[in-house]
């Protein structure tokens, strides 16, 4: 017999009963961590409690800024897995709807999102990272050693400048202590407060509801980062199958919504590519106590 989740029993079901629904019902296509329980609720899986805290804190904070976000009604713990039971937003994901939209509709939605982004950016911080712990989970800041929690402008600039000027491992290991002490050609010199950033405004994470309003989902990576990270994050997806006009519309859409940071985007993509291929590239600089030596790992792990 097919299981049917009873919305009225959301708070009376035991964790085990809800897990039975989660394990029995089909997940969303291409989103194995998300299981629709009913037309009203869905369950999203998380691997750690820290991930749950990051996501829930970000959604609560965004809601306090006046942004419509999915409400988390319950957190289910089963063995070592965690599930947030939250609102299922009605509508069509923007990556599906995008191909049917014209220029005028795209512009209208771009200005909608612009208002959301401005509201997010009204919240500022002198340190980077997620709300609960200040953990820098940005995919532009995740080499092997990562940054310390609540990283400062100095830490973030040093990290980005190190990878922007990374000469390759053979040359890096030959640097002198004096060469490790300063960045020869700094590209990044961010000196303003970090702003609250969704950090994954790809079209798959925006729902066009029946009233024509954009609803933002998937706040897992949200935190305080440089302004350019929001714009860059809007290009962090594959446009496979998109026509040239669809890509042009998205470029205009992201510029209106997030501001124009094409130079920063190109550098961030270069930086990400470099530390993806040379994840331990900062080790020599760290051993020398260089300008980019800040990490959240203990010293003994760096010296091993």
Where are these regions (language model features)?
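Juxta-kinase regulatory segment immediately upstream of eukaryotic protein kinase catalytic domains
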Residues: 1-23
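Residues immediately flanking
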Residues: 88, 199, 219
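Helical subdomain adjoining the active site within ATP-dependent kinase catalytic cores
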Residues: 146, 168, 175, 238-304
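Active-site Asp-x-Gly
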Residues: 191, 195-196, 209-264
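Catalytic-loop signature of eukaryotic-like protein kinases
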Residues: 200, 204-206
């Amino acid at each position: 017999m097919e299981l049917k989740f009873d919305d009225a029993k959301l708070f009376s079901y035991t964790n085990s009963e809800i897990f039975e629904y989660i394990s029995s019902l089909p997940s969303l296509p291409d989103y194995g961590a998300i299981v629709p329980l009913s037309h009203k609720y869905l369950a999203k899986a998380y691997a750690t409690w820290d991930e749950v805290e990051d996501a829930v804190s970000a959604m609560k904070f965004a809601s306090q800024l006046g942004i419509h976000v999915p409400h988390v009604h319950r957190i289910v713990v089963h063995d070592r897995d965690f599930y947030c039971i939250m609102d299922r937003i009605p509508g069509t994901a923007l990556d599906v709807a995008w191909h049917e939209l014209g220029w005028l509709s795209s512009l209208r939605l771009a200005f909608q999102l612009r208002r959301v982004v401005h509201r997010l950016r009204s919240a500022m911080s002198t340190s980077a990272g997620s709300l609960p712990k200040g953990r820098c989970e940005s995919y532009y800041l995740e080499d092997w050693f990562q940054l310390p929690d609540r990283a400062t402008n100095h830490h973030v600039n040093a990290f980005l400048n190190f990878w922007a000027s990374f000469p390759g491992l053979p040359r890096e290991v030959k640097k002198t202590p004096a060469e490790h002490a300063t960045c020869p050609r700094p590209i990044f010199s961010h000196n303003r407060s970090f702003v609250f950033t969704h950090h994954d405004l790809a079209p798959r994470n925006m729902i066009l509801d029946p009233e024509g309003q954009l609803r933002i989902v998937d706040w897992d990576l949200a935190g305080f980062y440089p302004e350019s990270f929001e714009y860059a994050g809007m290009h962090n997806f594959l446009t496979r199958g998109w026509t040239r006009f669809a890509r042009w519309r998205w470029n205009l859409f992201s510029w209106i919504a997030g501001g124009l940071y094409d130079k920063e985007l190109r550098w961030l993509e270069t930086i990400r590519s470099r530390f993806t291929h040379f994840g331990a590239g900062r080790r020599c600089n760290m051993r020398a106590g260089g300008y980019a030596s800040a990490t959240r790992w203990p010293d003994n792990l760096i010296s091993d």
